């Protein structure tokens, strides 16, 4: 099935805040003593379905973004746009592993099916991207990623300082679970001599 990517980020400007990014920045300082100048966030939605990307793009502000405080795009990674013109120090993308229940994705799927009821096999997976500015030089981005996700149920992709300079951004794909093979139960002789 084709996959459409939708990304949403808080607008920047007077009186506008990236609350998710601010929470991460403050928590890093409180828990680890790590001072970061700015953390910006991007909410991502991977839509696996037959609805054309153009139809999804026309409804982004209805389902995925609040157009007053957020900016959303379809099939474009926001980190490549003018909204993120300054080169960050690190970019970390976190999403659920295949087969793990994605509750925000399930809620998004319900809303999607309300708008596009004919695409009844559609499903949505979500992810969060954190864009770090003013990260200390000695900060290990793999350690940083470990503080942002639960390795048992989530996967993280990282762009370190060098990859950010080269504009090589982490891009998660739809988490398709592996096919489950049913094995016929077999009788076991439990008789002991």
Predicted regions and their residues:
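Core nucleic-acid recognition elements
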Residues: 1-193
């Amino acid at each position: 099935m084709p996959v459409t990517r939708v990304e949403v980020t808080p607008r920047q400007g007077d009186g506008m805040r990236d609350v998710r990014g601010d929470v991460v920045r403050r928590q890093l300082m409180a828990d680890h003593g790590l001072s970061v100048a700015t953390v910006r966030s991007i909410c991502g939605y991977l839509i696996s379905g037959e609805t054309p990307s153009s139809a999804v793009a026309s409804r982004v502000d209805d389902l995925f973004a609040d157009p007053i405080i957020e900016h959303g795009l379809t099939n474009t990674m926001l980190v490549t746009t003018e909204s993120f013109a300054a080169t960050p120090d690190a970019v970390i993308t976190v999403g659920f592993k295949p087969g793990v229940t994605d509750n925000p994705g399930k809620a998004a799927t319900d809303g999607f099916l309300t708008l596009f009821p004919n695409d009844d096999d559609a499903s949505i997976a979500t992810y969060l991207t954190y864009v770090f500015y003013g990260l200390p030089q000695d900060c290990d981005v793999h350690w940083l990623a470990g503080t942002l996700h639960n390795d048992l149920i989530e996967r993280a992709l990282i762009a370190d300082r060098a990859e950010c300079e080269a504009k090589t951004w982490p891009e998660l794909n739809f988490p398709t679970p592996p096919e489950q093979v049913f094995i016929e139960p077999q009788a076991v002789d439990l008789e002991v001599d």
